[in-house]
């Protein structure tokens, strides 16, 4: 059983989105999306819930619903960089656990948020903890929008990739390059869940780390930490989380769930 770890939840929320403008303020059952996410973080038991944004309208929406909000710079290349600014602003102690709850995940399971924080506390040799779940469909394995993680014997990440990892030579080569005929994986393949817990001392060093070639190639910010020698503990959950909101179709799907009478 995992120990209940005290933690702070930070919700980075960018107003600019190419596929879904003003996404943090999208209405979900009478409340902005960013507020729905903050409510989930509060349900997870966070000691403090902070919304971090470069847009005053997002900060106002959070404060109007009783949540703390902090203004951040507009030029951050990633959510982790935004969290690093918040950590520097508040001066949290080195061992403070800070969980990055994505601002477009209004259906995130509060228990998963809590468990990832506890997972970091259980791995003092790791700077970051995250989560993953098994996938069994070849279409997911070969989908570049599904990020996979390869794990060592302790479930510490060895690599994250949009490519199919681990690559099953004997199973896949006879079908390559016809992805449609690929068999389901006969070995554990894990999909990364974009939920992170950090130690505050790592967040303070993150902005000084040069971007890594693999980070730029894969467009995966967690690879910067690994490139510079940091370890990432991965919590395995058997339950796939609800999908986040990236497109108008995603928004319509989730809005339907928040309508009165929906289940």
UniProtKB/Swiss-Prot annotation:
Instruction: Write down the Gene3D superfamilies for this protein, in alphabetical order.
Output: Spore Coat Polysaccharide Biosynthesis Protein SpsA, Chain A (3.90.550.10)
Give the enzyme's EC designation: 2.7.7.38
Q: Which keywords describe this protein according to UniProt?
A: Cytoplasm, Lipopolysaccharide biosynthesis, Nucleotidyltransferase, Transferase
Query: InterPro entries under this entry?
Result: Cytidylyl_trans, KdsB, Nucleotide-diphossugar_trans
One GO term describing the cellular component: cytosol
Q: What class of enzyme is it?
A: transferase
UniProt pathway annotation: Nucleotide-sugar biosynthesis; CMP-3-deoxy-D-manno-octulosonate biosynthesis; CMP-3-deoxy-D-manno-octulosonate from 3-deoxy-D-manno-octulosonate and CTP: step 1/1; Bacterial outer membrane biogenesis; lipopolysaccharide biosynthesis
Q: Where in the cell is it found?
A: Cytoplasm
Any one GO MF term held by the record is:
3-deoxy-manno-octulosonate cytidylyltransferase activity
- Its primary localisation, in coarse terms, equals cytoplasm
Q: In Gene Ontology terms, what is a biological process of this protein?
A: lipopolysaccharide biosynthetic process
Q: Which reaction equations make up its catalytic activity?
A: 3-deoxy-alpha-D-manno-oct-2-ulosonate + CTP = CMP-3-deoxy-beta-D-manno-octulosonate + diphosphate
Question: What is the protein's known function?
Answer: Activates KDO (a required 8-carbon sugar) for incorporation into bacterial lipopolysaccharide in Gram-negative bacteria.
Protein family per UniProt: Belongs to the KdsB family.
Q: Which HAMAP family match?
A: KdsB (MF_00057)
Query: By what name is this protein known?
Result: 3-deoxy-manno-octulosonate cytidylyltransferase 1
Supply the source organism for this entry: Burkholderia ambifaria (strain MC40-6)
Tell me the organism's taxonomic lineage: Bacteria, Pseudomonadati, Pseudomonadota, Betaproteobacteria, Burkholderiales
């Amino acid at each position: 059983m995992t120990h209940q770890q005290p933690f702070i939840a930070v919700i980075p929320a960018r107003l600019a989105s190419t596929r879904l403008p003003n996404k943090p303020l999208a209405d979900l059952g009478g409340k902005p999306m960013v507020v729905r996410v903050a409510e989930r973080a509060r349900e997870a038991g966070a000691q403090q819930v902070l919304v971090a944004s470069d847009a005053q309208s997002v900060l106002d929406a959070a404060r109007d619903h009783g949540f703390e909000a902090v203004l951040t710079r507009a030029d951050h290349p990633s959510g982790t960089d935004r969290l690093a600014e918040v950590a520097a602003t508040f001066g949290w102690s080195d061992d403070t656990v800070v969980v990055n709850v994505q601002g477009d995940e209004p259906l995130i399971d509060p228990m998963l948020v809590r468990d990832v924080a506890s997972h970091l506390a259980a791995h003092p040799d790791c700077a970051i903890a995250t989560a993953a779940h098994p996938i069994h469909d070849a279409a997911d394995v070969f989908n570049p929008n599904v990020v996979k993680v390869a794990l060592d014997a302790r479930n510490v990440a060895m690599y994250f990739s949009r490519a199919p990892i681990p690559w099953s030579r004997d199973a896949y080569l006879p079908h390559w390059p016809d992805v449609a005929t690929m068999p389901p994986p006969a070995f554990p393949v894990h999909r990364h869940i974009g939920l992170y817990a950090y130690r505050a001392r790592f967040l303070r060093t993150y902005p000084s780390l040069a971007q890594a070639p693999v980070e730029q190639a894969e467009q995966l910010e967690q690879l910067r930490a690994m490139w510079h020698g940091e370890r990432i503990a991965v919590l395995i959950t058997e339950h796939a989380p609800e999908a986040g909101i990236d497109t108008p179709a995603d928004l319509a799907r989730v809005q339907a769930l928040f309508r009165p009478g929906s289940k």
